[in-house]
Amino acid sequence: MEINICSKDFIINVPSEGHGYVESDFVLHGLRIKNNTNESITLVDISFDLKSSCRIVKTINYIGEALESLVQKFYEEFRQTSIYGMGLYFGSTTFWNQSNFAKSILLGPNEETGIFNECFIVVYNSVIDELVVNVTYLKNMEKYKDSLRVPVVEYKNKNEYIFPVKGAWSTCGNYNNLLDHRPHYSMEFAIDMSQYNSELKLMHKENMDNEDFAAYGADILAIADGEVVDCYNSYSRISPWNWNERKILIEEYGFLPAQCGNYVVIKHANDECSFYGHMIPNSLTIEKGDIVRQGQVIGKLGNTGLSNCPHLHFQLMDGPDFLGNRGLPCYFSNLKDVTGMKIHMLTENNLIVHAE
């Protein structure tokens, strides 16, 4: 039995504390289970042991009908997923071999199955620091159990960052919204940013033009010193949400412009990279290869690519590849909440913050 995860060597936990307890919050983006034997096997149980300081705090099991449904649903959802979808969800186009997906819990030689975006939120008196994946199966009427131990860690940024816009902003798509950016490998900790008008409305009339939005045209700032390693400046469209229609634009312009509009990728020290998307066409003030300084204006907030209103899509990654590198939490040094209290990370969806 071969067991792999697509969260590389560890899973990122975003813990929070309160009332003497710790809430651990992490996602296993992909679990791959492959029958690497020469005989058929039957899956009996897939379980997850959540551990804190070597002690099992909670166990989650897929058995019986739940396991059968899990395998069948995985086959139906991912057997025809595009290479772009595989990159978005798992950070790799080769993590799974789609032609070898099993249709049931009976796995023939070289057949494989998996789990997509298993979310864990656990409240305990200490942080969860290890996930143990256990796979129990039958082969020739004998029961076997294989396991994989995965560290669960709290990630700390390697550099100091400022917020990519100034003033008061509404943020959404945060990591604790499990149905937005978080299922995607590089976008797990992505943030969308926009602004309300004086009446605290994002949309305040019908058929609004881009210029009617408070955020449109705002300066976008480099969050730290670095080198521009990729950018696009001439995409003028709002891409359709229909995949078949968007594929035409991908073939013409490339995946990233069709997805994110005009964008900038900056490589900072220690191989952390920031990404800024949906910018106004021809508003970029930098070019590939330029060295930028923290706080430098790199372009204007716009409404291009896969976007439903003017906003900035921002994310931090462990490399420059939107379809291959891992999303990272980003902590900011110049943020306050609406009460004036200093905060470092956006821990709630639809949070209003002020960047000094």
Region spans (language model):
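Short glycine/proline-centered loop/turn elements that form peptide/ligand docking sites
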Residues: 2-4, 285-288, 303-310
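Conserved positions in beta-strands of structured domains
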Residues: 227-229, 302, 317
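Zn2+-dependent peptidoglycan hydrolase active-site motif and core
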Residues: 225-280
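Acidic, glycine-rich catalytic/binding loops that coordinate metals and/or anionic ligands
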Residues: 247-250, 290, 315-356
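Short, small/polar residue-rich loop motifs at catalytic or cofactor-binding pockets
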Residues: 214-216, 259-260, 284-285
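Short histidine-centered loop motifs in beta-beta connectors
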Residues: 272-295
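Polar/charged, compositionally biased leader and regulatory segments
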Residues: 1-224, 339-356
